[in-house]
Amino acid sequence: MELGELLYNKSEYIETASGNKVSRQSVLCGSQNIVLNGKTIVMNDCIIRGDLANVRVGRHCVVKSRSVIRPPFKKFSKGVAFFPLHIGDHVFIEEDCVVNAAQIGSYVHVGKNCVIGRRCVLKDCCKILDNTVLPPETVVPPFTVFSGCPGLFSGELPECTQELMIDVTKSYYQKFLPLTRI
């Protein structure tokens, strides 16, 4: 199925020199600690918490509406420590997600309304289905599908997952166009 054009109002997004498109309705706390490596889309009502620890997002990533990206923490006897969050290239995070992972590899798809628990590790080329809740410190192996509450293994992905995710994220970016007056 071919993706149609996704038009947005140019005044509602900030476009950086490296091609990132960030909604003015999103909240980036501690923006000096947030690195978007290029051609990444952050849609309206998203929250990225760079004030807690560094957040690095790779190239050609999409973070859809109302998602929260927050670095993981660990409780110690003397308090709480936050750790950096690394997200790879060509990662697609759907609407209404809460991501509290330690690491998300490249070529990963996170479905709608998911909760990625504290300090989870999502390896390259994996998929989390809609409405999945991953418990804290879950490791999702490459080429697997996780679903349910709690999130458990439910299937495998083909070897071409990397190419498919590159295709999806690049075409989404190319079709995400400013609305021009006719």
Curated annotation (Swiss-Prot):
Its main location: cytoplasm. Gene3D superfamilies: Hexapeptide repeat proteins. InterPro entries: DCTN5, Trimer_LpxA-like_sf. CDD domains: LbH_Dynactin_5. It comes from the Eukaryota. One of its GO terms (cellular component) is dynactin complex. The modification N-acetylmethionine is found at M1. It is found in: Cytoplasm, Cytoskeleton; Chromosome, Centromere, Kinetochore. Keywords: Acetylation, Centromere, Chromosome, Cytoplasm, Cytoskeleton, Kinetochore. Part of the dynactin complex that activates the molecular motor dynein for ultra-processive transport along microtubules. Subunit of dynactin, a multiprotein complex part of a tripartite complex with dynein and a adapter, such as BICDL1, BICD2 or HOOK3. The dynactin complex is built around ACTR1A/ACTB filament and consists of an actin-related filament composed of a shoulder domain, a pointed end and a barbed end. Its length is defined by its flexible shoulder domain. The soulder is composed of 2 DCTN1 subunits, 4 DCTN2 and 2 DCTN3. The 4 DCNT2 (via N-terminus) bind the ACTR1A filament and act as molecular rulers to determine the length. The pointed end is important for binding dynein-dynactin cargo adapters. Belongs to the dynactin subunits 5/6 family. Dynactin subunit 5 subfamily. This is Dynactin subunit 5. It comes from Pongo abelii.
